[in-house]
């Protein structure tokens, strides 16, 4: 039997020597008897989380429950449930004894309790972030209870982890079991591993092992109680020590209190369904939740709604926790722009948010999106990029400009819109110094020679000024050629310049 279970967990049955991940430092907290480690992939160095559970006896009940947790996490997929990557079980010599250890590898996450200490939020910002997190965990619980007819069994602060984008994920599936409503008369345990749950987290029917009552209750009854425990721990700032402490509601926000009390109703059949909490809770009606929700369904919004939203977003972002804006909103915004669901006003917001990042982080989190956007066919996007190029142009490498950016920017030299031609011309003050001699001589000068006879007098004049400004970046042959053109140009229009200000 153990051999079968081990194969279920390990897949190929590989030992730790073949483990494709490096186990790193340990977090201070984790759910149950598990240990939560930082880790990295041996293939590409990408970060992961590694959870380990050890025992001297492979048949130890904690190990058996741990294998249930592995199986459940592997098979249950949802955006608000921790993403499973890999698992294995290894036997390692620990002195004269053999230690059996189960390893689960997941997306990189951090215990919620530790992330909250790190963020150190207060007041409205804290409540808005808690609302977003609770909204996510409620969706995970609703999915398990209502869609899958599964019971998690121990929803609490320790069973929640936080991703690098500050999203909350539900995990700790060792207790998770099917909701066995078709066997109401049975007195046998429905949750095989309920002994793992601390007594302070158990509703009355579970603490009494009243399985008949549990089977007659809705599938969300136990986990709704758990959501109440999570809410208490979040706002009190302390781990739940006794069930009686749940009656202390002094720290619970008034807008959440009615829902909190319904989640913890002493009658299981009257407890609030998590789906109703998601749909109706007043506590979830705040700027952060509404902003993220809007951005996640951006492709369903019409142009007017998008434009209105993005014109308001800079002011909203100023009021939200800076780390949440940079780690959650900015990646969603960048992705929306890349896939075409966001329009030009969103680019202005992206650049504003990006200005709050250190230079190295801007190059990692914002610049790749900007480079991709230069290939856009949206004229408004192209115009916005050119208009703001002074904000990011210096951050682009010469190779990126020469190979990825200039070929797309160059189409603007022959655009039918004079404004685009003018912006393209002015962008060369930033881009030309990063171009190769081959590109300058073979492409740029040809485009500029055409602009010298442009129908717009301002463009003709600015082209001549630009040639003088970039001559120092050319080789001797090209520079001499430009100088001859520069001194021989006669144009009666003289009020334009590359900065857009009159002479």
Residue spans of the language-model regions?
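Activation segment of protein kinase catalytic domains, centered on the conserved DFG
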Residues: 119-135
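Terminal C-lobe "cap" of eukaryotic-type protein kinase domains
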Residues: 266-289
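Short beta-strand micro-motifs within the conserved protein kinase catalytic domain, predominantly
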Residues: 83-100
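Juxta-kinase regulatory segment immediately upstream of eukaryotic protein kinase catalytic domains
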Residues: 1-25
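Activation segment/activation loop of eukaryotic-type protein kinase catalytic domains
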Residues: 157-204
């Amino acid at each position: 039997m153990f051999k079968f279970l081990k194969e279920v967990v390990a897949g190929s049955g590989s030992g730790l020597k073949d483990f494709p991940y490096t186990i790193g430092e340990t977090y201070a907290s984790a759910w149950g008897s598990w240990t939560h480690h930082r880790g990295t992939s041996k293939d590409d160095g990408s970060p992961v989380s590694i959870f380990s559970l050890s025992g001297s006896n492979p048949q130890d009940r904690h190990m058996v429950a741990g294998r249930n947790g592995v199986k459940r996490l592997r098979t249950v997929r949802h955006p608000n449930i921790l993403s499973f990557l890999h698992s294995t079980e290894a036997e390692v010599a620990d002195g004269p004894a053999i230690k059996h250890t189960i390893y689960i590898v997941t997306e990189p996450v951090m215990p919620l309790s530790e992330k909250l200490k790190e963020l150190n939020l207060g007041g409205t910002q804290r409540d808005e972030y808690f609302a977003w997190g609770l909204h996510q965990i409620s969706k995970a619980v609703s999915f398990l209870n209502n869609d899958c007819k599964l019971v998690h069994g121990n929803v609490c602060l320790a069973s929640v982890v936080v991703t690098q984008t500050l999203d909350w994920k539900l995990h700790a599936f060792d207790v998770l079991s099917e909701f066995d409503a078709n066997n109401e008369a049975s007195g046998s345990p429905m949750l095989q591993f309920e002994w793992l749950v601390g007594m302070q987290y158990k509703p009355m029917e579970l603490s009494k092992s009243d399985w008949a009552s549990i089977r007659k209750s809705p599938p969300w009854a136990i986990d709704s109680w758990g959501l109440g425990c999570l809410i208490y721990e979040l706002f009190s700032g302390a781990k739940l020590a006794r069930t009686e402490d749940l009656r202390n509601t002094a720290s619970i926000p008034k807008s959440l209190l009615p829902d909190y009390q319904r989640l913890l109703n002493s009658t299981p059949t009257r407890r609030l369904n998590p789906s109703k909490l998601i749909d109706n809770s007043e506590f979830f009606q705040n700027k952060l939740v509404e902003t993220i929700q809007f951005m996640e369904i951006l492709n369903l919004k019409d142009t007017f709604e998008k434009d209105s939203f993005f014109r308001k977003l800079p002011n909203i972002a100023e009021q939200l926790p800076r780390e949440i804006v940079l780690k959650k909103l900015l990646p969603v915004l960048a992705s929306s722009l890349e896939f075409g669901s966001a329009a030009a006003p969103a680019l202005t917001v992206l650049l504003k948010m990006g200005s709050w990042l250190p230079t190295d982080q801007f190059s990692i989190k914002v610049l790749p999106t900007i480079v991709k956007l230069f290939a856009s066919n949206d004229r408004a996007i192209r115009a916005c990029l050119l208009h703001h190029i002074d904000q990011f142009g210096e951050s682009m490498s010469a190779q990126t400009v020469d190979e990825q950016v200039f070929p797309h920017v160059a189409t603007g030299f022959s655009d039918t819109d004079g404004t685009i031609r003018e912006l393209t011309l002015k962008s060369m003050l930033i881009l030309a110094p990063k171009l190769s001699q081959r590109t300058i001589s073979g492409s740029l000068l040809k485009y500029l020679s055409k602009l010298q006879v442009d129908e717009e007098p301002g463009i003709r004049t600015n082209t001549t000024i630009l040639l003088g400004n970039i001559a120092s970046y050319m080789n001797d042959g090209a520079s001499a050629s430009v100088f001859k053109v520069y001194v021989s140009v006669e144009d009666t229009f003289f009020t334009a310049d590359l900065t857009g200000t009159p002479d």
